Amino acid sequence: MDTLDELYFKMLKKAVDGELELAPEGMDPRLIDCLTLPNDGTVVRVKPCLCPPDERHCAAACEWDALKPGNEVGIAVDTEKCVGCQACIDACELDSLKAKKDIIPVVQELHQYDGPVYALVAPAIAGQFGADVTMGKMRSTLKALGFTGMLEVAAFADILTLKEALEFDKNINSEGDFQLTSCCCPMWIAMIKKLYHQLLPNVPGSVSPMIAGGRTVKALHPKAKTVFIGPCLAKKAEKNEPDIAGAIDYVLTYQELRDLLSVTDLKPADMPEDAQPHASTTGITYAYAGGVAAAVKRTLEKLNPHRKIKLQTRKADGVPGCKAMINDILEGRRDGNFFEGMGCIGGCVGGPRAIIPKEEGKKCVQTYADSSAFETPMENPYVIGMLKELGFNTVEDFLTKSHLYDRQF
């Protein structure tokens, strides 16, 4: 019988070829579900767990108490608690836990759906498919795969930067006030919601750039399907959270996109340029730790250069680092008023489904960010024009009418 990886590539090739019957007869239904049911959890057990109860390293590695003894042999994953961080997958010594893949259903949509299908790529994509693969070449590649178009999520990071800068300017009025970000990291938000909920009043009610992108596309193109592409497994769980579900239909990782390219004849480096730059420097730098805080700080300086209480940033990356920073906040050792947390070491460039090392990824993102003609969203005509198309004609409108990008924690 095929292993999960063997089955995956066989089914992916059939999907690319347009075949309707993808799964061979007699395969374990858990393997089929892992490859074809993207909305039913993020981590699945594909074979029995034979570890003694006191040696279940997966459960010990889970920060969210999402792994429990199952009715069958082994472990059950609580999809309500799981945030898709991958810690349990890495800790499983029997290779029994796997992450779900969305790529096969996406390929089927590209063949069969009669409406537009948009790819929304996270800014950490810079360099992931080769140093010579520009954003324009990646756009051509995705269109050749069947996508209607490609949008940079960094543009929606620009929108959230503006929103968070406005909220900081409105809400931080004394030396004791402080604000927590980053809305872009589902692990950071999950940590606050599940473990440190007393800090929720200090979290701006903003969706992530991924959700902002999906909502914007669907506001402008109601029949569109949206596919996020990034280095993060936790985004697969985020898209299914009840209060924001529906904005993003599928989440692919860079590794899934690489797998798709491996069964086609497409080579991104050889594709023609289709350059449509629409993100600022600060939006692109969301991809690495410290980028969000720096973006909001620089934008606030342009919004209100004479502000008495300046934005003072502090950042942490990795779950232990984020926990340490939160404990400092709770114990009064703040050393700042704007706190950024990223669940992965290095930020998104260090995500579990990145293709290149995080240090190389950061350099590629910095190079791409430096090439932008716009430093912040304040100068970005693409973002300003999009906001006007959505009905935001002034800065004040965006502060008071930004329901499209709001989230209630």
Locate the predicted segments by residue.
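Generic low-polarity alpha-helical segments
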Residues: 1, 47, 55-58, 75, ...
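Short, intrinsically disordered, charge-biased short linear motifs at domain edges
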Residues: 37, 46-50, 67-71, 78-79, ...
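N-terminal [4Fe-4S]-dependent radical SAM core
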Residues: 26-68
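Alpha-helix N-cap/helix-initiation motif
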Residues: 51, 81, 202-206
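Iron-sulfur-associated redox domains of electron-transfer enzymes in respiratory
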Residues: 2-15, 19-27, 100-409
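N-terminal-biased segments
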Residues: 13-22, 33-48, 86-102
